[in-house]
From Swiss-Prot:
Belongs to the AB hydrolase superfamily. AB hydrolase 2 family. SUPFAM superfamilies: alpha/beta-Hydrolases. This is Probable inactive carboxylesterase Os04g0669700. One of its GO terms (biological process) is regulation of plant-type hypersensitive response. It comes from the Eukaryota. One of its GO terms (cellular component) is cytoplasm.
Length: 245
């Protein structure tokens, strides 16, 4: 689904990438879960849905999946097909690049993702040639090994990252969050790591609230707060984007 072709000045654009077995439509409510502030008052949201594919760690069951996962608990070595990840990244880039071509400032583009979607989100940001507004990873992991570092451009390294993880999560252990932040900081990136001791593998309102405040903070630092405009959010339900031609 192509973004709207309005010629009005483009507002901030947020891509939300869902977790394994979920859909974009089921996450639409998140656009209204962020408080109406300068950061998200007029944000345009996209909720793509992953293609349906067999997932090895779920005994080959067909479900929406950005790429195959071989093992659970999930770690970076649970992903064994790099090309599978890169195909997903290219589709995220296509969505972002269409928005930029339509007039959205790259620094007004944010990529958020939960679990497998968080893994795809951080991979997409690291491989994008431009500095984007930011990336928030909720209980995610790195879907690659350390050799991936040579592919990250100098511009991508300037994109700020928030990584939120639960100490009580067992599907994607807290070690994956710590290892991810260590990798990003090794690249010289600006990262924040927020751990909630009692949080399992789920998404809670207080995480969204923390993310919103993080976005406001980085916008303030960059002088891009803008005016608070109480207008309706535009939501793009990009269903099965990755299966479209």
């Amino acid at each position: 689904m192509e973004p709207a072709t309005s010629r009005a000045p483009r507002s901030r654009f947020v891509v939300w990438l869902h977790g394994l077995g979920d859909t974009g439509r089921a996450n639409e409510f998140l656009a209204d879960s962020f408080p109406t502030t300068a950061a998200f008052a007029d944000a345009r949201w996209a909720f793509p849905t992953a293609p349906t594919a067999p997932v090895t760690c779920n005994r080959g069951m067909l479900m929406p999946s950005w790429f195959d996962i071989h093992d659970a608990p999930i770690t970076s070595v649970s992903v064994r097909d790099e090309e599978d990840v890169l195909r997903a990244v290219q589709s995220v880039h296509a969505m972002i690049d269409r928005e930029i071509a339509a007039g959205t400032n790259p620094q007004d583009v944010f990529v958020f993702g939960l679990s497998q979607g968080g893994a795809l989100g951080i991979a997409s940001v690291l491989l994008h040639p431009k500095t984007l507004g930011g990336c928030a990873v909720f209980s995610g992991f790195l879907p690659f090994n350390s050799s991936f570092a040579v592919r990250v451009t100098a511009q991508a390294k300037k994109t700020p990252v928030l990584w939120i993880h639960g100490q009580a999560g067992s599907l994607i252990p807290i070690k994956e969050g710590r290892d991810g932040i260590k990798f990003l900081r090794g690249l010289g990136m600006s990262c924040e790591f927020k751990v909630y001791d009692r949080l399992g593998h789920s998404l809670e309102y207080y995480e969204l609230d923390y993310c919103q405040r993080w976005v406001e903070k980085i916008l303030h630092r960059s002088g891009r707060e803008g005016l608070i405009r109480r207008v309706s959010r535009n939501i793009f339900l990009c269903s099965n984007l990755f299966n479209s031609s």
